[in-house]
Swiss-Prot record:
Sites of N6-(2-hydroxyisobutyryl)lysine modification: 5, 10, 15, 19, 28, 57, 65, 80
Protein name: Histone H3.3C-like
N6-succinyllysine: residues bearing it: 15, 57, 80
Modified residues (Allysine): 5
Pfam family, one: Histone
Modified residues (Citrulline): 3, 18
Modified residues (ADP-ribosylserine): 11, 29
Subcellular localization(s) per the UniProt record: Nucleus; Chromosome
Residues with PTM Phosphotyrosine: 42
Subunit note: The nucleosome is a histone octamer containing two molecules each of H2A, H2B, H3 and H4 assembled in one H3-H4 heterotetramer and two H2A-H2B heterodimers. The octamer wraps approximately 147 bp of DNA.
SMART domains linked: H3
Function: Core component of nucleosome. Nucleosomes wrap and compact DNA into chromatin, limiting DNA accessibility to the cellular machineries which require DNA as a template. Histones thereby play a central role in transcription regulation, DNA repair, DNA replication and chromosomal stability. DNA accessibility is regulated via a complex set of post-translational modifications of histones, also called histone code, and nucleosome remodeling.
């Protein structure tokens, strides 16, 4: 037989399906699994943490610059009209507001995670209302 050249292909890394053993017809039957398998589910919170990680690594603003600038100008008009802002001032306001939001949401996240792990399905603002004495 003549030798021929073969091109190398990268392996896809997939597993080769195993051959099914032939079961003898002596009364033994294979368990029927009708192809129904459960979908893979991650533990609660795993997917949320995976979505958070890119935002933790990044250093850019999470709020878009122009909508934030419009909001700042709109709020400032309530106090005084015809105000002008330097771009550095708006950038500083945006950094401060995002830092505040991150701290605020982190504290809420920790309380929500603690509530999730304790399996307590109550809400703090409702508990405060329950503790108040009812007027007679």
């Amino acid at each position: 037989m003549a030798r021929t050249k073969r091109t190398a292909y990268k392996s896809t890394g997939g597993k080769v399906p195993r051959k099914q053993l032939v079961i003898e017809a002596a009364g033994k039957s294979a368990p029927s699994t009708s192809g129904m398998t459960k979908p893979h589910r991650y533990r609660p919170g795993t997917v949320a943490l995976r979505e958070i990680r890119p935002y933790q690594k990044s250093t850019h603003f999470l709020i878009r610059k122009l909508p934030f600038q419009r909001l700042v100008r709109e709020i400032a008009q309530d106090f005084k009209t015809d105000l002008k802002f330097q771009s550095a001032a708006i950038r500083t306001l945006q950094e401060a507001s995002e830092a505040y939001l991150v701290v605020f949401l982190e504290s809420k996240q920790h309380s929500n995670l603690a509530r999730m792990y304790s399996q307590n399905k109550s809400f703090p603002w409702l508990e405060g209302k329950r503790r108040q004495p009812q007027p007679m």
